[in-house]
Amino acid sequence: MTAMENVLEYVTATIGGQLFGLPISRVQDVFVPDRLTRIPLAPPEVAGLLNVRGRILTVIDMRRRLGVESTKNVGKALAIGVEHGGESYGLLIDSIGDVLKLSTVDQEDNPINLERGLAQASAGIHRLDGKLMVVLDLDRVLDFGPAAKAA
């Protein structure tokens, strides 16, 4: 990498067998969710509410949100704490990975054959040693407004 390239850091996470990257600047913490309170009439991807160190978080089931399913049992879920629009969220993931420093020059547009749900939540992709890392656009992932439902 040259000094002219922009480098971004990503926290990697696996959801339904797919590798995702979340901008590290948006990640507050990683934790094991406990005592989730269900919310009646909430959208199916909203798993419930959670109190984490005095903060109330809306917990999002990322498998459902992204339309990613997995046939294997992954055991106890983890959550990544993020903020969006002044609200705190916990994003349920299957596993947490490494922090990667990647050049913005190497980021590619979404492939044309990327599943629609992933494409709508993606800011692009990185190819890593035969794997595809989808870069999540957290603003799109956490947009539950009418415009998002119409898309």
PLM region spans:
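An acidic, low-aromatic, low-complexity terminal/linker signal
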Residues: 1-151
